[in-house]
Regions:
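Glycine-rich phosphate/diphosphate-binding loop of Rossmann-like nucleotide-binding domains
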Residues: 1-69
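Hydrophobic/aromatic residues located in beta-strands of well-ordered beta-sheets
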Residues: 2, 26, 107-108, 145
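Conserved short-loop catalytic and cofactor-binding motifs
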Residues: 7, 85-86, 133
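Conserved active-site and cofactor/substrate-binding residues in soluble primary-metabolism enzymes
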Residues: 10, 14, 36-39, 55, ...
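Alpha-helical scaffold segments in soluble metabolic enzymes
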Residues: 14, 18-21, 43, 96, ...
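Short, surface-exposed connector motifs at secondary-structure boundaries
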Residues: 22-26, 102-104, 127
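Rossmann-like adenosine-cofactor binding region
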Residues: 45-121
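Adenosine-phosphate binding glycine-rich loop
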Residues: 104-105, 111-153
């Protein structure tokens, strides 16, 4: 089971679609005003009990094998940062939340992280190798896309 905690933005949207397409159970916990894209939610409907959208981070994290999070205010949203911090205050990935997950659950973050906001320092440090591996692997995937695009046919 994969879960996403935070803003129902591009990361959440991609994880929901990708996770469901590959047969995973996916849970997303977001505040009501920050839900994933309606088209993504329509896509998820046929998957029934393989998808959970909730405001309850505990329900989303329960028995999760991997937990994803992202910043609460992305680049270009600086003017909304305080409002978003207030809205997402209870949506932090921390050791207490991970206690609800599978015993060997992984934590992922697309970086850069705002430690103390969406993820605690302790949790980030404990899972830093996994988090940085994700960032490195994303670089290789991006390079492969560039090669494909530049190669033409």
């Amino acid at each position: 089971k994969m879960c996403f905690i935070g803003d129902g933005n591009n990361m959440a949207n991609s994880l929901i679609v990708g996770g469901l397409k590959t047969g995973m159970s996916v849970a997303a916990a977001t505040p009501a005003d920050y839900r994933p894209d309606p088209e993504v939610l329509d896509f998820a409907k046929p998957y029934g009990d393989k998808f959970l959208l909730t405001s309850d981070i505990r329900a989303a994290a329960e028995k999760a094998d991997v937990v994803f999070t992202d910043v609460w205010a992305s680049m270009g949203m600086e003017e909304e940062a305080e409002k978003r911090r207030a809205a997402f205050k209870g949506y932090q990935v921390n050791e207490e939340l991970l206690g609800l997950c599978a015993p060997d659950a992984m934590v992922q973050h697309c970086l850069p992280a705002h430690r103390g906001e969406e993820i605690t320092d302790e949790t980030f440090e404990k899972h830093a190798n996994e988090i940085f591996d994700e960032a490195e692997n994303r670089l290789h995937a991006q390079k492969a896309v560039m090669v494909k695009l530049m190669a033409g046919k």
